Swiss-Prot record:
Pfam family, one: HSP20
UniProt xrefs under Gene3D superfamilies: 2.60.40.790
Basic and acidic residues bias locations: 86-104
InterPro entries for the chain: A-crystallin/Hsp20_dom, HSP20-like_chaperone, HSPB9
SUPFAM superfamilies, per database record: HSP20-like chaperones
Tissue expression: Testis specific.
Provenance organism: Mus musculus (Mouse)
Protein name: Heat shock protein beta-9
Keywords for this protein: Cytoplasm, Nucleus, Stress response
GO cellular component: cytoplasm; nucleus
Location of this chain's protein in the cell: Cytoplasm; Nucleus
Start and end residues of each stretch annotated as Disordered: 1-25, 83-104, 129-168
Polar residues biased stretches: 1-12, 158-168
Length: 168
């Protein structure tokens, strides 16, 4: 596993977003076999359509009770892993002593057409962790075949025009 030092963040903030540092820095995927940790952004409002292009991939994970720093989202090739742990202890003389532990673990395989470097991760106030991504851009058809898609000259349309000129 290799870590790369550039960030997934586009530098643009979404409406209602508070940036909270994740406990692991974000890293970009330069090659398929590298591992990346996505930053978890905390949103002030629930996720809604904002008129932007819809993501080609999205998943919602129940992470109620977790803070962004409690969650780790990793991409390893085409595998996505979401893990989180949280502990809380109290020793209140009037209420007694208690210890609470909570964990979440989700793992799935990403579609091969997905661009892992374009993935975003947001945590809503209601505790939903949204992971969104776009498909990789495909090269134009010319680059795929190596041939130009120029229209042919002298096709059926031009021969019809010539016939109409010959027959007045």
């Amino acid at each position: 596993m290799q870590r790369v030092g550039s960030s997934f963040s586009t530098g643009q903030r979404e409406p209602g977003e508070n940036r909270v540092a994740s406990r692991c820095p974000s890293v970009a995927l330069a090659e398929r076999n590298q591992v990346a940790t996505l930053p978890v952004r905390l949103l002030r409002d629930e996720v809604q359509g904002n008129g932007c292009e819809q993501p080609s991939f999205q998943i919602k994970v129940d992470a109620q009770g977790f803070a962004p720093e409690d969650l780790v989202v990793r991409i390893d090739g085409q595998n996505l892993t979401v893990t989180g742990q949280r502990q809380h202890e109290s020793n209140d003389p009037s209420r007694g002593r208690y210890r609470m532990e909570q964990s979440v673990h989700r793992q799935m395989q990403l579609p091969p057409t997905l661009d892992p470097a374009a993935m975003t991760c947001s945590l809503t106030p209601s505790g939903h962790l949204w992971l969104r991504g776009q498909n990789k851009c495909l090269p134009p058809p010319e680059a795929q075949t190596g041939q130009s898609q120029k229209p042919r000259r002298g096709g059926p349309k031009s021969s019809l025009q010539n016939e109409s000129v010959k027959n007045p």
